[in-house]
Amino acid sequence: MANKVKIGILNLMHDKLDTQSHFIKVLPNADLTFFYPRMHYQNRPIPPEVNMTSEPLDINRVSEFDGFIITGAPIDQIDFSKITYIEEIRYLLQALDNHKIQQLYFCWGAMAALNYFYGIKKKILAEKIFGVFPHLITEPHPLLSGLSQGFMAPHARYAEMDKKQIMQDERLAINAVDDNSHLFMVSAKDNPERNFIFSHIEYGKDSLRDEYNREINAHPERHYKKPINYSMSNPSFQWQDTQKIFFNNWLKKVKDNKLVLN
């Protein structure tokens, strides 16, 4: 695997095995190492599926990787200060920054990183952004190369970062939004290795259905709206091209950066 780029992934998602499978599929030509936050399991046993497929996060290993991903997490309605492992996340963010590793942050991971690096505030939404939506490219970026206006991508979150704050920060660019102006991608002009993605473009075609079913099974007393522009009975992989193009672009960015550093 010497010729492969090495990617570390901090997997914070609810379905650890599904998430791992998704990233293995979208990054087939990379050497992937999955991690879990140590502080999350300080006072409770580590689930077997986590222990078997992931390693405890070791900040000292960050420099081994050419790229690093922090996934989403089902905690976007919780204040950052209340997250039991937030300090561990911040140590990781600082280490990634120190070593200038290519960074890709998804959903909650993007929220935590934007808050840490730029002080951007998180806002809880009146209702969940949930479904598959067309998108507008507002500022071109290499990671969006090959995507056309109207490209499709899935969203599933209860919070949004403060767009006004982002727009007022000259270090940041909003590169794409959905048709309701919800964030898809924010990039850092001051540190081009940082990229923040608010869509779950790693999802497979059944993932939105699985997420909906998981929520209603966990809380049958609550009302959950079904995903928009998405058939629960016959899901369509409308974002497959988006997924392939985006991750190919990011892998190219990681490889190019590795060549420069070497």
Curated annotation (Swiss-Prot):
It is found in: Cytoplasm. The record marks D76 as: Important for acyl-CoA specificity. The record marks A156 as: Important for substrate specificity. GO terms for biological process: cysteine biosynthetic process from serine. Keywords: Acyltransferase, Amino-acid biosynthesis, Cysteine biosynthesis, Cytoplasm, Transferase. Pfam families: HTS. Transfers an acetyl group from acetyl-CoA to L-serine, forming acetyl-L-serine. In vitro, also has homoserine acetyl transferase activity. Belongs to the MetA family. This is Serine O-acetyltransferase. It comes from Lactobacillus acidophilus.
